[in-house]
């Protein structure tokens, strides 16, 4: 790597320091291209502090380079620099967090940090997303910190670092990594699998067993709410960040109103993590459960953030230098112009959203996939097209049908209102939604099948506030029944999501009933809704949320609707999977509206005054029945997904 001699480890010999060096060498050569590594070195060494021959970064250098607001910036209320520095100091010691954490941010440590946070370790280690979650938890856990013994040399360097740095590291050791002999049963059989894979790749299993015994202490450690809130607020602000975009494009406009919106979303996400039984902190069990199931893309913004290390503005690799050849490998330069606002995900149309604020869009990207690929909504380059809003199109199912049934793509339903019967928790405003990757169909009781192996093709029902809750789509083929569509609407009963639709009846009006773990029903006037959620039930469209326990009662909320919005999911033209030109959902909808207008004009010209049995009369009646405008056959009016 250019910072030391690379030597291979024979057998099981070697110290943790040497093994850490070898792993960093392997990461650098296999996880980065030569050009990326050149840029990485320039970024690091051009800014590093030289203390007794050791080059390293302190907290201020790291925060300034990444553009992360910290306590030194009195004009910015987002103080996330110390949290990121703490995480990096922990991850830099991988896979020997017990012995080497907190690590000095040398080049080798930063290489490991960049590989782990950009998820490039798959070229050296087997992919293990769950184990990355444990590493992230360990890097954030600060309840019950302790002083870690270190060799005199390392301690001297750390002392010199503190003396020479204007900003302290805030990292004094990690109780999360203290070996313990407490018996926690088989709570997590694959602890430290990612670290184990690293040592397996170095033929150093014995060293691993000596340094990092099965560590059950992790289940006693906690992440403080204050620490996690600061990280969440940063992730919300930089969620739309693209590779090599400057962070300041998103952090420079943090006025009071923007920060209030960011805090609100952070608090709704925090509410999903159980802290009642954790002494005010977040336990590993809660952290791992929620981040892996209810917030699978929460840490995605860290990838483009740390990819900034792989491009240096000081280098122009396309020019000749003396007799050197032109470097053919290219890397995209970051734009100097301000980055786009998160709201640019919304395309212009018939209305502007009163629900989709930038912070809400960021919140959605933490758990909603792109319909075209298994990445989050923002990284999948999706756009949202305004399809229907009660504020503009009125509270009528006729208008809903005209706008939604003609949309031939996936949709996102959002609902904002007030709980009409506040619970003992004092809930007031609530924001709900449903992600429906399949288009609505005009045929009654139809059901679009999904691919169980493709999570992006599964629907989900969610609550954004006051508490983040996600009901994932059920991948079981057994729940795909004609009378249990994902979403259904009828002019007689309204809109039903995740419900069982009763058979038609001439004698009485039967309404859809909740099925499985969750459902949402909206009345025919689009004025009120009922949200149903249970901790049990695997026989419906949606599975129970990870944020509830088996002991919790079924939740039923009656909601007075303030705003109902439907947004169409539109992929970027450049992301179209087919090389053949194809009409977009927007163009198809316009074509359907034009067809409906022509048919309406044709119906106006029909002679309905002809005598009984007249062929014109029969033809007119047939046309109107076919259009579903007259006739009393059961199920004639309605639609579903």
UniProtKB/Swiss-Prot annotation:
Does the keyword field hold Transcription? Answer: no
Identify the Pfam families for this entry. TLD (PF07534)
Q: Which UniProt keywords apply?
A: Cytoplasm
The cysteines joined by S-S bonds are none
Q: Which residues form the TLDc domain?
A: 354-570
Q: Where in the cell is it found?
A: Cytoplasm
Q: Which family does it belong to?
A: Belongs to the RTC5 family.
Q: What does this protein do?
A: May be involved in a process influencing telomere capping.
UniProt name for this protein: Restriction of telomere capping protein 5
Q: Which organism is it from?
A: Neosartorya fischeri (strain ATCC 1020 / DSM 3700 / CBS 544.65 / FGSC A1164 / JCM 1740 / NRRL 181 / WB 181) (Aspergillus fischerianus)
């Amino acid at each position: 790597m250019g910072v030391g001699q690379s030597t291979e480890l024979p057998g099981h010999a070697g110290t943790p320091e040497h093994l850490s060096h070898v792993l960093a060498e392997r990461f650098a050569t296999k996880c980065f291209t030569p050009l990326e590594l050149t840029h990485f070195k320039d970024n690091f060494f051009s800014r590093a502090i030289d203390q007794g021959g050791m080059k390293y970064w302190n907290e201020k250098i790291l925060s300034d380079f990444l553009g992360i607001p910290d306590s030194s910036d009195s004009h910015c209320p987002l103080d996330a620099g110390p949290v990121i520095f703490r995480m990096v100091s922990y991850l830099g010691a991988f896979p020997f967090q017990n012995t080497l954490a907190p690590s000095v941010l040398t080049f080798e440590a930063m290489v490991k940090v960049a590989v782990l946070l950009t998820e490039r370790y798959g070229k050296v280690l087997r992919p293990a997303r769950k184990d990355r979650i444990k590493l992230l938890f360990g890097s954030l856990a600060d309840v019950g910190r302790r002083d870690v013994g270190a060799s005199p040399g390392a301690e001297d360097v750390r002392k010199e670092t503190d003396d020479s740095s204007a900003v302290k590291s805030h990292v004094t050791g990690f109780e999360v990594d203290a070996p313990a002999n407490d018996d926690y049963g088989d709570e997590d059989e694959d602890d430290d699998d990612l670290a184990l894979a690293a040592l397996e790749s170095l033929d150093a299993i014995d060293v691993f067993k000596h340094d990092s015994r099965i560590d059950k202490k992790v289940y006693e450690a906690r992440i403080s709410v204050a620490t996690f809130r600061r990280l969440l607020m940063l992730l919300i602000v930089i969620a739309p960040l693209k590779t090599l975009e400057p962070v300041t494009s998103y952090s420079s406009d943090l006025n009071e109103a923007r920060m209030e919106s960011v805090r609100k979303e952070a608090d709704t996400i925090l509410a999903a993590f159980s802290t009642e039984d954790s002494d005010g902190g977040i336990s590993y069990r809660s952290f791992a459960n929620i981040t892996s199931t209810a917030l699978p893309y929460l840490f995605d913004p860290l990838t483009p953030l740390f990819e900034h290390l792989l491009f240096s503005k000081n280098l122009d690799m396309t020019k000749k230098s003396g007799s050197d050849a032109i470097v053919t490998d290219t890397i995209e330069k970051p734009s100097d112009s301000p980055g786009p606002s998160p709201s640019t995900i919304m395309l212009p149309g018939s209305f502007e959203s009163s629900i989709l604020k930038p912070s809400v869009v960021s919140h959605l990207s933490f758990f909603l996939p792109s319909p075209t690929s298994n990445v989050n909504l923002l990284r999948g380059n999706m756009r949202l097209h305004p399809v229907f809003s009660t504020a503009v199109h009125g509270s009528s199912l006729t208008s809903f049908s005209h706008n939604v049934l003609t949309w031939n793509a996936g949709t996102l339903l959002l609902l904002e209102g007030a709980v009409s019967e506040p619970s003992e928790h004092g809930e007031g405003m609530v924001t709900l939604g449903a992600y429906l990757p399949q288009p609505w169909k005009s045929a009654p009781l139809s059901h679009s099948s999904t691919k169980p192996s493709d999570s992006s093709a599964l629907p989900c029902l969610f609550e954004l506030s006051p508490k983040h809750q996600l009901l994932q789509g059920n991948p079981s083929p057994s729940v795909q029944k004609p009378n249990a569509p994902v979403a259904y609407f009828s002019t007689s009963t309204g809109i039903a999501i995740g419900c069982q639709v009763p058979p038609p009846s001439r004698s009485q009006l039967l309404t859809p009933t909740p099925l499985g773990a969750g459902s949402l029903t909206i009345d025919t006037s689009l004025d009120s809704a009922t949200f149903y959620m249970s901790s049990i039930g695997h026989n419906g469209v949606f599975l129970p949320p990870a944020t509830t326990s088996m002991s919790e009662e079924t939740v039923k909320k009656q909601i007075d609707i303030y705003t109902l919005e439907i947004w169409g999911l539109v992929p970027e033209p450049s992301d179209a999977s087919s090389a053949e030109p194809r009409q977009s959902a927007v163009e198809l909808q316009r074509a359907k509206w034009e067809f409906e207008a022509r048919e309406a004009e044709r119906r106006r010209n029909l002679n309905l005054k002809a005598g009984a049995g007249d062929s014109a009369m029969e033809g007119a009646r047939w046309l109107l029945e076919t259009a579903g405008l007259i006739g009393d056959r059961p199920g004639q009016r309605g639609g579903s997904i």
